[in-house]
């Protein structure tokens, strides 16, 4: 995927290795967490600093994928598919699990690429949002991006889950915003996709595994 997207060439020029997560580490959860054990890629756990660089996109299961959802990528292998199954059709349960993983990873910095965002159904369409945002609080960043595209926070399960467990700052009035104000960058025509369940069917898991093998063969 890195080769096909052009990232591999840029990374090689800059001397940056692209790593496939191969080993996971069990992380002890906090008492109020949903599960008894969490697995995160060993490379993430061993890193001195974690910088989270999500692309700002609409999402057909969670409405938006920004800072918190992107950190689900720190879960190695096909464990992500099993976690989808574990959550069933409960979007709030899935949102809470995403928040818990985000808290465990604890990135020191998040930079959200919203220069050319993605909106709409299916594979999505490009949307020239024209913003680049950054911060140290992934909840605050998700909350601000909800405001930018007009998604009420009470309808975004990730923000509600963060509020429930007391992680991050979800109150817009308590978030310090530097640079352009929200009124300067907010839009009213961002298209959200039709929602689908968060659980994966066994058929989808099998087809995903086959697609993963195919991508590895042509990479």
What do the PLM-derived regions correspond to, one by one?
Residues 1-219:
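N-terminal and secondary-structure boundary signal
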């Amino acid at each position: 995927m890195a080769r096909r997207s052009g990232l591999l060439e840029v990374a090689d020029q800059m001397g940056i290795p692209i790593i496939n997560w191969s080993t996971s580490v069990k992380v002890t959860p906090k008492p109020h967490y949903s599960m008894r054990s969490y697995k995160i890629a060993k490379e993430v756990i061993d890193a001195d600093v974690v910088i989270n660089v999500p692309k700002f996109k609409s999402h057909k299961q969670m409405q938006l994928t920004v800072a918190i959802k992107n950190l689900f990528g720190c879960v190695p292998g096909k464990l992500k598919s099993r976690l989808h199954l574990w959550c069933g059709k409960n979007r709030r349960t899935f949102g809470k699990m995403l928040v818990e993983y985000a808290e465990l990873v604890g990135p020191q910095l998040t930079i959200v690429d919203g220069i050319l965002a993605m909106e709409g159904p299916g594979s999505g369409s490009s949307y020239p949002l024209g913003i680049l945002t950054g911060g140290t609080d992934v909840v605050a960043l998700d909350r601000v991006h909800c405001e930018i595209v007009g998604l009420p926070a009470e309808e975004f399960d990730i923000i509600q889950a963060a509020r429930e467990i007391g992680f991050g700052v979800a109150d817009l009035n308590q978030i310090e915003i530097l640079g352009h104000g929200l009124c300067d960058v907010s839009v009213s025509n961002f298209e959200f996709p039709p929602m689908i369940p968060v659980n994966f069917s066994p058929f989808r898991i099998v087809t995903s595994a086959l697609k993963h093998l195919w991508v590895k063969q042509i990479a």
